[in-house]
């Protein structure tokens, strides 16, 4: 970690206001960052390489309306063979620069047919459906903060549809079956994905305020007839629905 920070200190001057972790297909957000420096993960000592399509593996340092940000364009997943602790290495690095908030984003499956695809969801609880430490799904409550209230207010003011609900973590890499989706819904899940939860736990462990925002790119298996879920469709839909996602993050960061 020392070598990593020593390398990054050459490019990061002063404290950071917000850090952002981008989910699959949501990388158009980086176009909003000004005066940016782009560092490739593979050139940063101690960093892992990203392998999943839609995760470029870049750390972007810059500004949004004079607000200092670090943006991780690419994340690491449990199904790639990384432990929660390894996934949390990125959070530990970001925490070193004293961000006020960590915005953890993802593209996820929508489990509520009353919600339109392309709408956004902010997590107010988490369901650990990984069965790594328990033979039952485990509920983790989200501790609300002033930043969450601000985000909800900004969404309302700008007519951005922002639902609140439970994000469900599965290990992947295959998508859930229709029976699994039904069970997740019965446990109160509103969105499902293969990331984010490890980062949330690491933020919680380090007392780093965080908000989890999901772009709902597809409906869960079995909710629509004859629909097959493919990763390329998730990426395409994330790009298709990028405007509200980008606008919400930009407006929120500008308000800091």
Where are these regions (language model features)?
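Metabolite-binding pocket within alpha/beta catalytic cores that recognizes anionic/polar moieties
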Residues: 1-139
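Generic non-transmembrane alpha-helical segments
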Residues: 7, 11, 150-160, 247-255
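Non-catalytic positions within long, well-ordered alpha-helices that form the structural scaffold/packing
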Residues: 94-98, 185, 204
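Short acidic/polar active-site loop segments enriched in Thr and Asp
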Residues: 100-101, 190, 209
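Active-site/ligand-binding-proximal alpha/beta "capping" segment
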Residues: 153-190, 256
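Zn-dependent metallopeptidase/amidohydrolase metal-coordination segment
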Residues: 194-233
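His/Asp/Glu-rich mid-to-C-terminal helical/loop segments that flank catalytic regions of hydrolases
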Residues: 221-256
